[in-house]
Amino acid sequence: MIKVFVVGYGTGYASWIHDKKIVENIEDADVVVFTGGCDINPKLYGCAQHESTSFSRQRDDFEVQTYKQVRPDQVCYGACRGAQLGCALNGAILVQDVSNHWCGGTHDISRVFGEEELPEELAVPSLHHQMMYPYDLPKEDYDLLYVSKHNRSQYYHGDKITDEKVAKLREIGEPEVVIFHKDGNPVFFGVQGHPEMLSPDHPTNIVFNKILRKLIHEQHD
């Protein structure tokens, strides 16, 4: 049984996790879930606010303080905003505005070379206008598992999103599933999409459950 603590509101964000129990205290959890919602404050990743960005300083402060309570033997999971928060708290920045990712349905994501044990393609629901940008981090601080099957956005806007960074997005791909494992921080499983909008037995969630269980096992070893 996986013990899950959901930060703030929205226990439905954990609906895709198999064989779980929602717990009321973070210290009892195997997994700490950071949910979706509004954008995060760009100050969290050292950038100026783009005109399209809207955030709740109160929520940001609460979730950052909660993140600081997570132990090394616990795993963080974030969906959409939650993944972006994890990205920022591990030292990376965000693209503050993109197109064609608020699709109201699913789109395909593709496995990144080197992760052959994972299926080549998965489908994820997508409802976001911002995007993780982990590519400036040291390679040992993260694993890029999936990117958009095709680069969907027509533009990438935001402070510090230079032509060089745009070129990396077009070359490597638009990040969809990233595991952050910076030394000194808890492991953070970030999913840009919304697996909670799929049934728990959907093929995508079968894969995500395997990933999550592997991370939990590794932290308990």
Give short role names for the model-derived ranges.
Residues 1-21:
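Short, charged N-terminal beta->alpha structural module
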Residues 6-9, 27, 34, 56-72, ...:
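Amide-donor transfer/coupling interface in amidating biosynthetic enzymes
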Residues 14-17, 26, 86-87, 135-137:
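Short loop/helix-cap segments at secondary-structure boundaries that form the rim of catalytic
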Residues 18-77, 90-91, 95:
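Flexible gly/pro-rich beta->alpha loop and the following alpha-helix that scaffold active-site loops
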Residues 37-38, 83, 195:
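Active-site metal-binding loops of divalent metal-dependent hydrolases
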Residues 78-79, 193:
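Active-site neighborhood of phospho(di)ester-bond hydrolases with catalytic His/Asp-centered motifs
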Residues 79-88:
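Glycine-rich nucleophile elbow surrounding the catalytic serine of serine-hydrolase chemistry
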Residues 84, 92, 130:
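Glycine-centered loop/turn positions within well-structured domains
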